Amino acid sequence: MAADIRIARKNAGKVGLPEINLGVLAGTGGTARLTRLSGKAMALEMMVTGELMSFEDAHGCNLINHIWEGSAEDFRRDILDWCSQFTLPNKAVKAVGNIKRSCQTGPEIPFEYHLALERELQASLFNSTDAKEGIAAYVEKRVANFTGQ
């Protein structure tokens, strides 16, 4: 649940927090993350019953973004291919990092502070080489080639 984007391989497992069956709670962030991802009622039900759910059910509870079919080897290859869209030279990694920071920090602070954080993060990107490349590529109707600068 701590992953930014969660992708499962069809029929390769189940999702849940069964720690209650050991007489403990889902520590190390389990209760906090699950509550934020799926809402209080669903999180409570999952944690107090300790039941595991299919990836399809987990997808319906916003715990999994995508479910892909294929062998373990194909899945690994497909994941790496899919993730390449978020890395150099396809995306500006500083912008990706700032998006992650805003999305992770923002919900924990008042809305007006989240907007201020977003403005600060955006301002930090405008003078970057990658922002200049992205804007130039847009104007010139070509694909940007980001460098991480």
Regions found by a protein language model. Give the residues of each.
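CoA-thioester-processing core
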Residues: 1-47, 78-82
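Well-ordered beta-strand positions
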Residues: 5, 45, 49-51, 57, ...
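C-terminal long alpha-helix characteristic of the crotonase
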Residues: 8-13, 55, 64-116, 129, ...
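Hydrophobic alpha-helical segments typical of transmembrane helices
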Residues: 30-33, 42, 95-98, 118-121, ...
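Terminal peptide-recognition signature
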Residues: 34, 58, 99, 138
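C-terminal and late-domain segments of enzyme folds
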Residues: 124-125
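Short, basic/aromatic-enriched C-terminal tail that caps enzymatic domains
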Residues: 134-149
